[in-house]
Structures are given as C-alpha cells and as structure tokens.
Amino acid sequence: MKTIDKAEEAQLFATIDRWIEREVAPRVKEFDHADKWPAEIVEQMKELGLFGATISPEYGGLGLPATTYAEIVMRISSVWMAITGIFNSHLMLALAVEKFGTPRQKEHWLPKFATGEIRGGLALTEPDAGTDLQSIRMVAKRDGNDGYVING
C-alpha cells in the first residue's frame, strides 16, 4: 500500500488549494461558457504533477496513495469538475499500462504519461447506448490463442 508523510500531504493539499483559488476558480465560467479547451490550466496541471499523480516514482510520477489522490480530485471537483476528467481518464489508462503492460511498454509510455507529454484517455460508446455504460452490449470473446473477436 502506498503511503505519504502527513506533512508532505498537507503541503501538497495547500499547493493544490492555492492553485485552485488563484488559477482555476477565476476562470471556470470563462472556459465553460465559451466551451473552450483550458490549455493554460492543462499546462499548470502538468507542472503540478497531476498527470503523474498515481504513477510510480520509478517512472517519474508522484506515486500518491489512492486516498490522497481522491482528496485532490475532490478539491478540484468542488470548483470545476470537468477538468478532473482530463487527468482522471488519463490515469485510468496509465494504471492499466502500469499493472498489465510489459516492462518495455512501461518504460516507453509511463514516463511520458507522468509528465503529461502524452495523455491517455478512453472512449466508450455504442450506436444504441451512446455513453451510457450500463446500456453497452458489446463483448470481446477469446478466439483461440490468437486474440479476441468483438461482437460489435
């Protein structure tokens, strides 16, 4: 189980809170109403290490425990939930690579994910389901030892 020193965690939360107060909160309406990509905010998220928040330090990430990460997401979401999706979906893919990737894949992708140089994401949709995950019916079935067959 990952751990973090309480003083270090408090300092991290204080940094996030200052960033939210100074940079995020004043701009939420501007970006939301203009339906504009928050490029400057994303760059700041890179600088804060949010794209590597849960990635192991071995690959350049912060290696935060889930509880610390969840608190960060909660704090940011309380002001602007939409921007948490930018790094949350990214970290879902990073987690899959870190847990299930080959050593070569990990060495290649995780350092780039950790810095935000490249970002992962996910897309879930079907013609009759849209993005309603409960309605998705497509499945992948193993086809011998060579791979999978997808029914959609």
Which functions belong to the PLM regions below?
Residues G61-L62, R104-G152:
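Glycine-rich, Trp-frequent "lid" loop and neighboring beta-strands that shape
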Residues D17-K29:
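N-terminal capping segment at the start of a domain
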Residues M1-Q11:
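Intrinsic disorder at enzyme termini
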Residues T3-I4, R27-K29, A96:
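Short, contiguous strand/loop micro-motifs
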Residues D17, E47-E107, P111-G116:
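Internal helix-loop-helix
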Residues K6, E30-D32, L62:
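A generic secondary-structure micro-motif detector
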Residues R27-L48:
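Short secondary-structure junction/hinge motifs that connect adjacent elements
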